From Swiss-Prot:
It comes from Hydrogenobaculum sp. (strain Y04AAS1). SUPFAM superfamilies: Thioesterase/thiol ester dehydrase-isomerase. Keywords: Cytoplasm, Lipid A biosynthesis, Lipid biosynthesis, Lipid metabolism, Lyase. One of its GO terms (biological process) is lipid A biosynthetic process. Involved in unsaturated fatty acids biosynthesis. Catalyzes the dehydration of short chain beta-hydroxyacyl-ACPs and long chain saturated and unsaturated beta-hydroxyacyl-ACPs. PANTHER family: 3-HYDROXYACYL-[ACYL-CARRIER-PROTEIN] DEHYDRATASE (PTHR30272:SF1). This is 3-hydroxyacyl-[acyl-carrier-protein] dehydratase FabZ. CDD domains: FabZ (cd01288).
């Protein structure tokens, strides 16, 4: 699945769209996504000048976006009508830095998936080395319901 298809499913846009491609997907079970980490990412301007590292919270957000795609597709939710929002994060660990030029591969495996709530185990790797992992909980909400 390419980025244009991804943008039909989740509402995230630049500079917070953090998934470029879906490589694999088994509905209700697992998904694998890819983020090409460019030196031009806006977060590198301040994290850290001269020593660019991808912030850990953005690795979690990237995993969550990939998991959100799996959730929306698996539950058969109407495309373009829902956003998946964080409900919780457990056991987050950051193992290695992510640099400009890296390809961040994110694999999410479903632990539970019910109605509009999910729990997934996420693992992010670069060059087959784990850089981050976490248990992510999320809720699907109609976009209209999250407006102020």
């Amino acid at each position: 699945m390419d980025v244009l298809e991804i943008m039909k499913i989740i509402p995230h846009r630049y500079p917070l769209l953090l998934v470029d491609k879906i490589l694999e997907m088994e509905l209700g079970k697992r998904i694998v996504g890819l983020k090409n980490v460019s030196v031009n990412e806006p977060f590198f301007q301040g994290h850290f000048p001269g020593y660019p590292l991808m912030p850990g919270v953005l690795m979690l957000e990237a995993m969550a976006q990939v998991g959100g795609i799996l959730m929306i597709k698996s539950l058969g939710l109407e495309i373009g009508k829902y956003a998946v929002v964080f409900a919780g994060i457990d056991e987050a660990r950051f193992k290695r830095p992510v640099y400009p030029g890296d390809q961040l591969i994110m694999e999410l495996e479903t632990i539970s998936l019910k109605k509009t709530i999910s729990k997934m185990k996420g693992t992010a790797t670069v060059n087959n080395q784990v850089v981050a992992e976490a248990i992510l909980m999320a809720a699907a909400r109609e976009l209209e319901s999250i407006k102020k």
